Curated annotation (Swiss-Prot):
First-listed, main subcellular location of the protein, grouped into a coarse class: nucleus
GO CC, alphabetical: nucleus
Zinc finger (GATA-type): 178-203
Tissues/organs with expression: Mostly expressed in leaves and stems, and, at low levels, in roots.
Keyword Zinc-finger: yes
One GO biological process term: chloroplast organization
InterPro entries cross-referenced by the UniProt entry: GATA_ZnFinger_Domain, Znf_GATA, Znf_NHR/GATA
Listed name of the protein: Protein CYTOKININ-RESPONSIVE GATA TRANSCRIPTION FACTOR 1
Coiled-coil intervals, chain numbering: none
Gene assigned in the entry: CGA1
PROSITE patterns per the UniProt record, alphabetical: GATA_ZN_FINGER_1, GATA_ZN_FINGER_2
Length: 353
């Protein structure tokens, strides 16, 4: 058995002479048949030697021999024109060869060969660099090269500016020195008595505080005394105002019901009065009142004695009048009686009118 492709055979075959049998070559005379992608098997002349005879057998052997030789030549040369009529649907040897992926000869575990190749400098494009490994590095806290903490952006920029100025001054041969402490390093130069930027930061702050204290001491002698007198005046006036308020609010401190409550003054006077050595009767003040009333025995001369809080003269007079026996008998005994008396008075007025 020998393998051949239909496309390897010539498109036209020589015409057979005489009355040769054309049925032996049916595939060679079908021009409209589609090309066959896969080879088919043709029996060799050795197997059909008993059936083939004469010139027909010789010609058939010659055609098969030429086709096999042509196919072998193309396969040995590896040409791209194996198929005489290329088609986009049939692969070619060249396209298959270009699509093949060639494996790299680099072995990452073969350390000795890799070292030799790097030493010799003979590296191909397939093994130019070993595969890189991804590394995740955690960014630590940024620290100052000197060991301190990170400065703020503004301070960092200012320090950088000061360092650049110092480097420039050192390059020019000029070194700035504080006129007070003779230091050459400071975060900020301040103005002083010797001129601008003649003091370091600490000396400038110290001298500024001293100047302010001296100015306050010079200008504050005359201004401090009036300020003290003005400040002391309200302190003396405020307690007086508070006392006046308390004295005026003595009568208004109680609720309205307690201030207008009607009390049986006769029973209260009998229970509360007690004779004294001088023959006077002392009427005890109710709980709601802030004074004690002393009434004489015969002439009923009423006087007022302050108990705890001082009261005005009008309040004392009203209290003395209320403490008299006639006033006690004239008042009703309770609210119901008072209401009945008011109702009778109104009805009596309506009848007489």
């Amino acid at each position: 058995m020998s393998t051949i492709y239909m496309s390897q055979l010539p498109a036209t075959l020589p015409l057979m002479e005489g009355d040769q049998d054309q049925g032996l070559y049916p595939a060679f005379h079908r021009a409209k048949d589609p090309p066959i992608l896969f080879p088919f098997m043709i029996d060799s002349a050795v197997e059909h030697q008993g059936q083939i005879y004469g010139d027909q057998g010789l010609r058939r052997q010659q055609v098969l021999g030429e086709s096999n030789q042509q196919f072998n030549d193309h396969m040995m040369m590896g040409g791209s024109d194996v198929f005489l009529t290329p088609s986009p649907f049939r692969p070619t040897i060249q396209s298959i060869g270009s699509d093949m992926i060639q494996r790299s000869s680099y072995d990452p575990y073969d350390i000795e060969s890799n070292n030799k190749q790097h030493a010799n400098g003979s590296t191909s494009k397939w093994m130019s660099t070993p595969p890189m490994k991804m590394r995740i590095i955690r960014k630590g806290a940024a620290t100052d090269p000197e060991g301190g903490a990170v400065r703020k952006p503004r301070r960092r920029a200012q320090a950088h500016q000061d360092e650049s100025q110092q480097q420039l001054q050192q390059a020019l041969g000029v070194v700035r020195v504080c006129s007070d402490c003779n230091t050459t390093k400071t975060p900020l130069w301040r103005s002083g008595p010797c001129g601008p930027k003649s003091l370091c930061n600490a000396c400038g702050i110290r001298q500024r505080k001293a100047r302010r204290a001296m100015a306050a001491a010079a200008n504050g002698g005359a201004a401090v005394a009036p300020a003290k007198s003005v400040a002391a005046a309200p302190v003396n006036n405020k307690p007086a105002a508070k006392k006046e308020k308390r004295a005026a609010d003595v009568d208004r401190s109680l609720p309205f019901k307690k201030r207008c409550k009607m009390v049986d003054h006769v029973a209260a006077a009998v229970a509360a009065t007690k004779p004294t050595a001088a023959g006077e009767v002392v009427a005890a003040a109710p709980k709601d009142q802030d004074h004690v009333i002393v009434v004489g025995g015969e002439n009923a001369a009423a006087t007022s004695m302050p108990a705890q809080n001082p009261i005005s003269k009008a309040a004392a007079t009203a209290a003395a009048a209320a403490a008299s026996p006639a006033f006690f008998h004239g008042l009703p005994r309770d609210e119901i009686t008072d209401a009945a008396m008011l109702l009778m008075t109104l009805s009596c007025g309506l009848v007489h009118s």
